[in-house]
Amino acid sequence: MNWLPEAEAEDDFKGLLSGDFFDDLINHLDVPLDDIDTTNGEGDWVDRFQDLEPPPMDMFPTLPSDLTSCGSGMAKAPRVDIQRNIPALKQSYSSEALSSTLHQSSAPPEIKVSKLFQSLSPVSVLENSYGSLSTHNNGSQRLAFPVKGMRSKRKRPTTLRLSYLFPSEPRKPEKSTPGKPESECYFSSEQHAKKKRKIHLTTRTVSSTLEASNSDGIVRKCTHCETTKTPQWREGPSGPKTLCNACGVRFRSGRLVPEYRPASSPTFIPAVHSNSHRKIIEMRRKDDEQFDSSMIRAVISRG
């Protein structure tokens, strides 16, 4: 069962595949004519379409009954005059193509170049790629390494001061009078410190004298030089705490002789006593020489 009569099909295809249509199509496509074989074109196309057959009816089981029953009605469909409509299509297509080409040629070259650079600018491509990479890297870093908040600055522990190890009475700052300058205040503080030192020394001497006195009220004296003031009492030939500090050191070293006296001793005589061991030896040698000379004179006088 054929869809269209053979004569009508041949006329329709011949009208569609006319020579003018192919020429117009080749001009618009800008294809070289050497690649197209125009010999025996119409005969080949007609032969190919004649070999075609309509599909079998088994492929359309749900086809409506009107189409299946009225096959003759479809064959009597009104014939469309394709050859008449083709020139109108050619004219409309050619007018549109000419208008588009004129519009493109009338455009200034600067706009074309700018559009070309806008579309194919390597800088924009690099910026877009760099932006996409940076956003990707930022996202990955945020996921892989979460940023912690700012750490609060801890106060450093203060160093231990000497005042904690050696507590002393806090010094009260001296109030400077409006009439006195700062230099006078500084000198007054130094004088005050010197006075404190003197008082401390006097109390020390008083304590040494108090230690020298016995419980019975008798003042202690050195058995060798008879001094009463000494920083420390030492052991002597008469017992403990019987010699002053200087005489006790000489007694321990074995150089305590009758000619030795400290300069602060009340019994010190420069012609007889000395606080230097070398001078004491010289004095003894002179005494021995004088004794020897006196003995020789006595023997000579007797003879």
Swiss-Prot record:
Its localization reads:
Nucleus
Gene name, Swiss-Prot/TrEMBL: GATA11
Its lineage opens with: Eukaryota, Viridiplantae, Streptophyta, Embryophyta, Tracheophyta
Organism, per UniProt?
Arabidopsis thaliana
Q: Looking at the UniProt record for this protein, which Gene Ontology cellular component terms does it annotate, in alphabetical order?
A: nucleus
Per UniProt, the GATA-type Zn-finger stretches lie at 216-270
Q: Does this UniProt record's set of keywords contain Ribonucleoprotein?
A: no
Entries under Gene3D superfamilies matching the protein: Erythroid Transcription Factor GATA-1, subunit A
List, as start-end ranges, the regions of compositional bias called Basic and acidic residues. Answer: 169-183
For this protein, the record's PROSITE patterns field holds: GATA_ZN_FINGER_1, GATA_ZN_FINGER_2
Q: What is its main location?
A: nucleus
* Gene Ontology molecular function terms on file: DNA-binding transcription factor activity; sequence-specific DNA binding; zinc ion binding
Homology family = Belongs to the type IV zinc-finger family. Class A subfamily.
* Assigned keywords, A-Z: Activator, DNA-binding, Metal-binding, Nucleus, Transcription, Transcription regulation, Zinc, Zinc-finger
Q: What ranges does the record list as Polar residues composition bias?
A: 131-141
InterPro entries this protein is in? GATA_TF, Znf_GATA, Znf_NHR/GATA
Say yes or no: keyword Transcription present.
yes
Q: Which domain of life is it from?
A: Eukaryota
Q: Which Pfam families match?
A: GATA
Q: Where is this region: Disordered?
A: 131-189
This molecule's function is given as: Transcriptional activator that specifically binds 5'-GATA-3' or 5'-GAT-3' motifs within gene promoters. May be involved in the regulation of some light-responsive genes.
Q: Which CDD domains match?
A: ZnF_GATA
Protein name as it appears in the record:
GATA transcription factor 11
